[in-house]
Amino acid sequence: MAADRIPATVTQYIPLSIEAGDMTDMAHFNLNNIPKILEQAYVYIIQNAQDTYREFFRIVSEERNTPLLFHCSAGKDRTGIAAALLLGALGVDRKVIMEDYMLSAEYLKGKYDAIVQAHPEFAPLTTVRKEYLEAAFQTIDSDYQGLENFLRNQLGADIDRLRALYTE
């Protein structure tokens, strides 16, 4: 993994992590089911990483933290969910959120070629699929009565403040 290249204008760095879990022992997984496993991982993140996303929304709600850059080592799963939740809080339509999420596939092209060449069965781990984020949204809709309720009640997001900060 290459070192972070953070713009010189960044004035503060706030590490905020969600444990990815130990994916090193792939022997226990049926590698043909990796897409289904990743769908389940997105559901797991929604259900079990709420403290971290609550802190994320606290940070992005503070004007002193704007403008804001957030990222992750791969930048597609945990960060993809964060971006989707933030865009949802800002009132962006889900279709547009999904289009934005799917752009990650384009930006990740080539990044994992050596791994996929050596282990083609790992290819689904190196990209995004709409089913992954759809699984997260389905969980939010069914378990938390929709995105706005999830954001406000589970994550403590101040949607009005976020919209005032990030939209015109």
Task: Give names to the regions the model predicted.
Residues 1-69, 82-168:
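Cys-dependent protein tyrosine phosphatase-like superfamily
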Residues 74, 78-79:
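Ser/Thr-glycine-rich phosphate-binding loops at phosphate-binding pockets of nucleotides
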